Amino acid sequence: MKAVILAGGLGTRISEETHLKPKPMIEIGGKPILWHIMKIYSAYGINDFIICCGYKGYIIKEYFANYFLHMSDVTFDMTSNQMEVHQRNAENWRVTLIDTGDDTLTGGRLKRVATYLDDGEDFCFTYGDGVSDINITKLIEFHQQHGHLATLSA
């Protein structure tokens, strides 16, 4: 199962932070909100993520492009221009980053990532700026038992 995370809004209510970076990249305990959301889903066995990027999406792309390096112990040999990775602390995640536009609304963002979702497969869909204490397994079970098109938690 995949988790689609909306990470493209402007974050106007906390503009003192979001003029530099998108709201999902605001840090809590030294890690972006987005990372915390992904850790929660990962704890429930969901490790395949589609991130709907928009406003300053390049910052999210740069974060994941450099994630492995930042989470590992490395030695840089400046004389030989070599890098040696000693310890890898990366997550067991697959992250697809899609530019869904700066002004695209929620439905439009979901439509733009549809090609990255498997036909007929259930997926989780969440905002990238809020962390909650929801049992994802029970939520998915509830959804599957009731056979509806969508299940909303709030």
Residue ranges and their predicted role:
Residues 1-62:
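N-terminal glycine-rich phosphate-binding loop and ensuing alpha1 helix
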Residues 62-154:
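Conserved beta-loop-beta/alpha segment of the NTase-like Rossmann-fold superfamily
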